[in-house]
Amino acid sequence: WEQRKLGELTTILSAARVHKEEWRTAGVPFYRSSDVMAALNGTENERAFISQELFEKLSAQSGAPQKGDVMVTGGGSVGTPYIVPDNKPLYTKDADLIWIKRNAEIDPKFLYSFFMSPIFKSYIRSISHVGTIAHYTIEQVKETPLLMPCSIVEQKAIGSFLGDLDSLITLHQ
C-alpha cells in the first residue's frame, strides 16, 4: 500500500458555470449535490436539466462526465461520492460537484469506498472551518491523502467487495 495525494493520480476539475435561468424542465440531466444525496438515500428530488445545445457547447469547452468518473459533493454534505453509471449526456453544477476523471491508476468503486470511509469523514472535518458553510474545493480534493493498494487488481477487489457489502446491508434494512 502507498499514500498518495488524489491530485497525483488523476485529473480533478469542475464543470463550466450554468446560470439558473439556463435550467430547463427537460433535456440533459444537470446534477447538483442534492441529486447525489438523493441517489445515495434512494429518494427523489426536483430534477434540473439543460438544453442539448447548451450541453454541446459546454462539453466542447470543458468536457462532460463519462462512465466510471466519480463526482464528489463540494457543497452541502461535502465529500459524498457518486459514480457516473453510463455515458448518457450529463452535466454538473460547477463547484457544487467536483469531477474526478477515471483513469487506469484508480478504481472508481475503491475511490467511492474511500469517500464513504470514517477515515475520509474525519479528514473532511479536520479541513472544514467551524462556523462557516462547509465547502470541499478542487484544491482540497487534489491535496486529499489516499492510502491505497499499488495494484489496480487489488483496488478492484476491495471496491467490489465493499460495494457488495453495502448492497447486502441496504437489502436487509
Where are these regions (language model features)?
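A short beta-sheet element
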Residues: 32-34, 44, 49-120
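A short glycine-rich beta-alpha junction/loop motif
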Residues: 74, 90-98, 129-154
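Amphipathic alpha-helical segments with low aromatic content
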Residues: 1-2, 140, 144, 151-173
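Short, tandemly repeated low-complexity microdomains enriched for cysteine and small residues
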Residues: 19, 42-45, 171-173
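Non-catalytic DNA-recognition/assembly elements of restriction-modification systems
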Residues: 1-15
